């Protein structure tokens, strides 16, 4: 591979070889040219990186980078240095793939007579499986986002954190701990706590593997800290899309019962649909708990439920369990068919919370439907 450097710069057709007059003439004639940085020779650069400490570079191993392209536009290397200087940038914090560019950038600052900022080259975020840095393709293949927002290309859409339902604070918290910690086992930080605790000197040199499940765990932690009213407001549009609308207090109650099991608000419907619509099918495995004597027991349960006036979860549970104990009925013979009748499967939050939310009439209707169906 050809490398333009001190070994060949004076052996090529360049302004270092031809005269100034010839150079000016060829430029005036419209001949295309580039402007390169003339890297000094025989020098060892001892540079400081906040994360990696002292790093050394031999200038004889560096090439002469293009600063202005043939169309007159500056390259990134030049534009970056000028921008950072004009903006009075104090710290340049970037990925370690830019470490090889550090000597050129420092030499450019020196050539301009400007004070160079401090540099910190962060470790890369690595693939969750295998070796190499995380890429868009990894997210597409394994089903997790790598972009803040949905990214559309002719080949398709790569999902974004916002559209997936991640809280910004959760993503920041997760990313901050990839290659850094505060010296303790603490994992959950508010933004203010992160600002106070974060120190580049504690960033590791080695890359950290991206763990999609840990990412979801962080989002779960932030989700359960949200107020029920906030989550209910976020869930309401999803519910409306499904064709259902309920009173605010009911939705707040539902959210309070399911949020401990959710990672995202988008999961709420799958976890709570039975609060709003009666089951039309019954889980095949769970249906095996429906025995020949079950219909009779469920009819008796209906009579018990009909007689309850204080229809709160705690009171309903007390009365139903007292009836079970008094009649010496195995609790599994009632509770599993009861849940199957209301939910269609053996899942969901506390059974008597479900009963309270859907109400007496709906509870009885669902038991009757299960008796007729199963």
Residue ranges and their predicted role:
Residues 1-141, 145, 157, 182:
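Active-site cores that bind ATP or allylic diphosphates and position pyrophosphate for catalysis
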Residues 69, 87-98, 126-173, 178-183, ...:
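Conserved phosphate-binding loops in nucleotide/dinucleotide-binding enzymes
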Residues 114, 179-184, 224-228, 266, ...:
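Short helix-capping/linker segments at secondary-structure and domain boundaries
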Residues 161-169, 205-211, 245-254, 325-333, ...:
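Structural motif
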Residues 175, 219, 255-262, 335, ...:
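Short alpha-helical scaffolding segments that buttress acidic/His motifs in well-ordered protein cores
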Residues 182-237, 247, 252, 256:
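Active-site-proximal acidic segments at structured loop/helix or strand boundaries
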Residues 228-327:
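Small-residue-rich helix-loop
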Residues 313-374:
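Charged substrate- and nucleic-acid-binding regions of tRNA-handling and nucleotidyl-transfer enzymes
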């Amino acid at each position: 591979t050809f490398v333009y450097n001190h070994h060949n710069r004076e052996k090529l057709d360049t302004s270092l070889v031809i005269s100034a007059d010839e150079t000016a003439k060829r430029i005036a004639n419209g001949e295309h040219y580039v402007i390169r940085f003339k890297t000094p020779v025989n020098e060892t650069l001892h540079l400081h990186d906040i994360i990696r400490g002292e790093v050394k570079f031999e200038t004889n191993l560096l090439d002469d980078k293009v600063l202005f392209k043939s169309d007159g536009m500056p390259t990134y290397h030049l534009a970056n240095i000028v921008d950072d200087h004009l903006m009075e940038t104090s710290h340049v914090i970037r990925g370690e793939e830019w470490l090889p560019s550090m000597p050129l950038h420092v030499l450019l600052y020196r050539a301009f007579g400007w004070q160079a900022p401090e540099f910190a080259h962060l470790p890369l975020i690595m693939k969750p499986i295998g070796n190499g840095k995380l890429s868009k393709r990894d997210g597409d293949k394994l089903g997790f986002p790598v972009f803040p927002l949905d990214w559309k290309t002719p080949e398709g859409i790569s999902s974004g954190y916002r559209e997936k339902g991640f809280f910004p604070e959760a993503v920041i918290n997760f990313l901050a701990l990839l290659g850094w910690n505060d010296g303790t086992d603490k994992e959950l930080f508010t933004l203010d706590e992160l600002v106070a605790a974060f120190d580049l000197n504690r960033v590791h040199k080695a890359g950290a593997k991206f763990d999609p499940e840990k990412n979801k765990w962080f989002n779960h932690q932030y989700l359960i800290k949200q107020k029920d009213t906030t989550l209910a407001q976020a869930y309401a549009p999803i519910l409306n899309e499904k064709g259902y609308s309920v009173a605010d207090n009911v939705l707040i109650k539902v959210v309070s019962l399911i949020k401990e099991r959710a990672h995202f608000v988008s999961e709420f419907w799958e976890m709570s649909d039975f609060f709003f619509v009666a089951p039309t099918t019954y889980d095949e495995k769970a249906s095996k708990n429906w025995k020949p004597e079950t219909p009779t027991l469920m009819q008796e349960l209906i009579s018990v439920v009909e007689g309850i006036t204080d229809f709160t979860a705690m009171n309903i549970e007390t009365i139903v369990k007292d009836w079970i104990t008094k009649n010496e009925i195995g609790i599994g013979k009632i509770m599993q068919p009861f849940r199957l009748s209301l939910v269609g499967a053996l899942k969901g939050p506390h059974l008597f919370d479900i009963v309270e939310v859907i109400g007496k009439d709906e509870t009885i209707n669902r038991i009757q439907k299960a008796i007729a169906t199963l």
